[in-house]
Amino acid sequence: ILLPTVVDFNKDAADPEKYRYIYGCISKDMGADINFTPDMLATEIRMLNYELGILPTLSDIGVTSDKFEQMADDAMKSGNIQCNPQFTMKNDILKLYEQAF
């Protein structure tokens, strides 16, 4: 659910070739002459989620916005934030949750 939103958040800081490679692995439309943009990866992930039956929003799976603070605190404690291509603060994570809500 969060991955397309996170891809959008990271698109300016991430390695575009990594995004292009991932897009090529999951897209049915990847061609040699494609003019790839990182937005295409986020769109493709959303389509893949749909095909797999993954609901599109946090609210669809029963997450309520009053949980965002604790979720963001937990995310900041995980080791994943340090690996993120875009510098990320708790407020950024809260915005991502709101976008995915």
Language model region names:
Residues 1-67:
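Gly/Pro-rich interdomain helix-loop hinge
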Residues 64-101:
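Short, amphipathic C-terminal "tail helix"
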